[in-house]
Amino acid sequence: MRVALKLAYIGTEFHGSQIQPNVETVEGELFKALRNLGIIESPKSANYTCAGRTDAGVHALEQVVAFDTDKLNLAIPRVINSELTPGIWVWAHAEVPLSFDARRDAVSRHYRYVMSGKEYDISKIREASKFLLGTHDFENFSRTNGEKSTVRTIERIDARIDGELIKIDVVGNSFLWNMVRKIVTALSMIGKGVRDTDWLLQMLNPEIYEEGIESAPAYGLTLLKVNYNEKIEWIEDNYSIRRAGDQNQKRILRHRVMAEVLEELISHE
């Protein structure tokens, strides 16, 4: 049988999602848990697939992975979570066809970037985002990673103000390495008035215009959702969701305390 999982993770606690030697990664921790439980022997023998790689510091709410196993009774969120570090949690599972590939079968991916909104003109960001919709060559918005083509399609970009923050949602069929974070950088520059839409149009024509721009910080980016055409009967584990929520409330409290401490360090009072 083949099982798919939805997992979430705090990206700042890992050196990316893809397994690497000598550093802690999301896949490294997941594979260790699955092996310890006897769910798989190895990723290769289980035909493991993942919806997409996230870089160090990037978070996920709904990363999707799939693998073959004959231990369906163990391949469920609360059992797997018992072997996972608190920075990762599985919260839904489903039986899927043996042919299901979490990456190739995905039709779109939804990312959200959160940043401070005090310095930006949201109307300029929204206007500029319209030029990015559709199919373009995003070579100027990526780090070279051996991709055969840098042409990608963006289906939707939404920018909105939420209190003192700006949230930018980007939905597309697939993304190049660092593409979303570089798009955020470009929109931020336009929102600050440092660049304009004429420059953005030039950036979308890499055959005649080349410019490297920095990626926005990884900690603001989350993979929110991966979409598939085929209907998958996901079973959510409310206990695992509730437990993760409790742990994240503790993280929120810690960050609030740290924010106050930093304010005191600035004020010298």
From Swiss-Prot:
One of its GO terms (molecular function) is RNA binding. It comes from the Archaea. Formation of pseudouridine at positions 38, 39 and 40 in the anticodon stem and loop of transfer RNAs. The lineage of its organism: Archaea, Methanobacteriati, Methanobacteriota, Stenosarchaea group, Methanomicrobia. Keywords: Isomerase, tRNA processing. Its EC number is 5.4.99.12. The active site is at D55 (nucleophile). The gene is truA. It comes from Methanosarcina barkeri (strain Fusaro / DSM 804). Belongs to the tRNA pseudouridine synthase TruA family. Substrate binds at Y111. Disulfide bonds: none annotated. PANTHER family: PSEUDOURIDYLATE SYNTHASE, TRNA PSEUDOURIDINE SYNTHASE-LIKE 1. InterPro entries: PsdUridine_synth_cat_dom_sf, PsdUridine_synth_TruA, PsdUridine_synth_TruA_a/b_dom, PsdUridine_synth_TruA_C, TruA/RsuA/RluB/E/F_N. HAMAP family: TruA (MF_00171). This is tRNA pseudouridine synthase A. GO terms for biological process: tRNA pseudouridine synthesis. The keyword Isomerase applies.
